[in-house]
């Protein structure tokens, strides 16, 4: 459950409106989203129908009907976040989010997670922000009554199930989340330092959503009950149901399960409390995990829906986004201080902030960076910007708006967000129009009002021992760091088999889970395919739910076509392809893309290079024309090539200190062997990237860029004939040539297990990567092994690994296992981040689970696995991304479009004996690589107790630059 899962960033601003009471019990509303592209006269019309009604206890309910797929999203949002906490109990709103998933009186042990594992849900989850907490998942529509019953149980019949032991265990889980996302990450403490200094002491935004380790540990059971009784009440909640369902039936269920939950005390909205600075503040911190000096500059901003929020959104993008932006021109191109500058306007319910973030090249003095920022601002004041600049920003907002509506869950999030913070789900229409109405004068006015010459908070986060790089007159930031000890289990707790509690009275028996509705019959999308005269294969699916088209052109090769002594060529080439064409400068190409509101990206992977495009349907042909120009008329700009190399080297430097990146890169070396091409990261190494020339890129392009190894996949509001006609120029101009895709010998799985350790001194967590090189996705056992893995580690909260290491012991925030592969063998891997002082205990428990799994896999496990995998098929083609993935499987592996039915047949017929044998064969703990990335001084020697011999320190495998 993420602390800040910004799934709602569809519209770039949200702001506060005064609360008003809805007295209408039921209202039928239609919001017509009419968005005018600022670069064209055409309009795209799209409407979202919704119905809103309010129960007598104050629960606000919103329905949105969408019958395009047999799925329904359910989102329950509470108007409470960390801003409602008090000092000394920070992190409590987020802790409570975790607790609400664990158990309720009638759902029983495992709560919604356990039910989700049976009904085919997309994974029950939640998120906490400063101002709201939400709980959500998408389910097949036959499970809607079950979800309504479950959400009501969580709201009204939960609190008695929380015991001292339950609270103690979940504290450990949340503290692990903080270690993983904050304490063990480069720049993880930056937001803490900024907020503590931007807002005055006691301000609701002066502490972090996740809180402090000390405050989390001090939370009491009475705190939990008080928080629940105050904030988790119907009159502080919004329930959204979106998807394919019967409205009248859903209303009956909602009344049945929610009506008798009592209304809580009335809740007054928080008053706006904008930040205010009398003078600038400068802080610094020596970061153990940073390899690049980072500068943040943060100014006080405005709250949600403030009239100036819209112009500030556009201002920050004009200043930092793209090659015409003054910050990019000065810091990246002129001064060569960094590869990227990020600037954004952030709005919360009662205040906001305007942030600038840049990570400079290694060894760069941040005083030079600050001077360059000021120079960029001066340039903006002198030169301003054009109407076309303004229009391209607005065009991007329009496309992003529609992209955010691709799933019923995305629509549910929007409706809930606007209902809570604007008291009107339909405010989204006005919100967009306010963005589109921003003028040049508005932008310059807010620049002068909020940025120019105004005080700010600046933070210098530098690698340890490099304080010579910090801003002058900076004071050391106060950051509390956890001390690492050799071993220990943290707070002890014992979770009973059954929790004893007093039942909450109800007018009817809630203990029986409702039955399924009519079983949905998901339709497999109709696929069309053709081969162009030049040899490129094209696969498509028509989908008219949204006025969008998404497509990709994939060329076999990528890293596999590179020389191991010169890796990184395909990655640099992919990056350079969007940096201008023969007929367009980098700035002109970027502007042409943005004026269409389109997105075009090129990226290189281990086995392919992909050109991906996304646009409004009306702009598809113009977007494709730009893709054609990018592919066939590269610019090979020497200046852009050098900038791309600098950026890549900076990325490599940062990865060298990130424990998760270290784990991934080291695991691949151990899987494939040091000299195998697939053991390398596609971005290359310091040594190889420094030596790559522009001629290397041209040679790679001239040799390997051919329609003979290309497939196109396209999904959206466009038919087959239109697509084929649009490809005529590419078919004619792109000539076929033979490209040889090499076949590599793949190493065998190890005959015995070995423990490897990569030392990251003072790491607050240990990153685990256990596994071996298994099989390709085309192997007959691949999907069967995936079925086997569901209960082991692929089923989220339903899996053994999660239940034991997270729910049972509190060792980790998350752990998973899975098979990955393509037409060549991929690994089986187990990955997690665990508290440092239980590194051995975690590894030993994983080993035990693997050893016992074949013999302990039960008929009930098999039935739950089958139920989930069969029922979850209802939602597997909901989004354009999932449809593109289907087309990729068909084109890459030669599968028929109905391969999904074959997989369903496999699920239905697999037996317990087969699963047990698959586990013995493909999840054998005695034939694996056991890699740990963490603090060797306190943890490495203990791992010899696993019984796999003395751990091998692998830092020496990676010499400087390699």
Write out the residue ranges for each language-model feature.
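Short, Lys/Arg-enriched N-terminal segments with co-localized hydrophobic residues
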Residues: 3-16
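Bacterial N-terminal signal peptides
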Residues: 25-35
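A common structural junction motif
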Residues: 152-162, 257-265, 374-384, 630-636, ...
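Short, conserved secondary-structure transition motifs
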Residues: 174-181, 273-286, 393-404, 615-616, ...
